[in-house]
Amino acid sequence: MKTEIYKLSAAELSSLYEEKSLSPIEATSSIINRIKDVDKKINAYVFIDEESAMKQAKESEIRWKNGSQKSPIDGVPTAIKDLLYTKGWPTLRGSKTISPNKEWNDDAPVTARLKEAGSVIIGKTTTPEFGHRGTTQSPLTGVTRNPWNLERTSGGSSGGSSSSVAAGMGPLAIGTDGGGSVRIPCAYTGLFGIKPTFGKIPAWPLSPFGTIANVGPMTRTVKDGAMLFAQISRPDWRDWHADSSMDSN
């Protein structure tokens, strides 16, 4: 393959999976190796769960071989901002006040939708403390840097997600946006990202910012953004604001 695997878009990965010329295991291994190579300088991830990611990738590979893939993003490595619950993992929110030993028993709606779609969830990305900053630096993780220029910020508060995607540490990432926390980092790192209409992507627990804060996709291409949006915009019973009337496809 001429293009290095970690540089491929989600749409390209999905197409190669379908052709059986690339496997989710190969893609996930490439992304994990990329994280190990470059994230010490960038600091986009709070943590990765390599064992879990490879297990998810193996399960996805079986589905693609059997023609029973769950969605176009089945087997595609994905990162989640560390403000959003992921079952079995801590959600530290960039703060030293939260115990790293506290694992959550529930998935946020967006995490649940990603798992239902078969996405390979790699790990959690950095955020300023409780998301209350326009740059991504916190007492817990320090400074997250822009992969295009390590002396520059990647913006905030979803700067970990934007840096991970821009640096090839995964083609898909999830951010949250109240006053620009998806849009600013995407602008700073050359990505596609949107703050969706309130209620289009379900959220739980509800944000302290009320109707201002939304969950949004962060990707290198518009096509990838549309693929991701279609999966995470499915309704969830825990969010009574969520709109189930619109077609995401």
What are these model-predicted stretches?
Residues 2-178:
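Gly/Ser-rich catalytic/binding loops embedded in alpha/beta enzyme cores
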Residues 54, 191-193, 217:
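Conserved hydrophobic/aromatic beta-strand scaffold that supports enzyme active sites
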Residues 75, 191, 214:
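Broad gene-expression machinery/nucleic-acid interaction feature
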Residues 88, 156-159, 186-189, 196, ...:
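Short, solvent-exposed loop/turn segments at the edges of secondary structure
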Residues 91, 132-136, 183-188, 206-207:
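Short acidic, glycine/serine/threonine-rich loops at helix termini
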Residues 100-105, 185-188, 219:
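Short, conserved loop/turn and helix-capping segments at secondary-structure boundaries
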Residues 178-204:
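Glycine/threonine-rich beta-strand-loop-alpha-helix active-site module
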Residues 195-249:
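A short helix-breaking turn/cap at a secondary-structure junction
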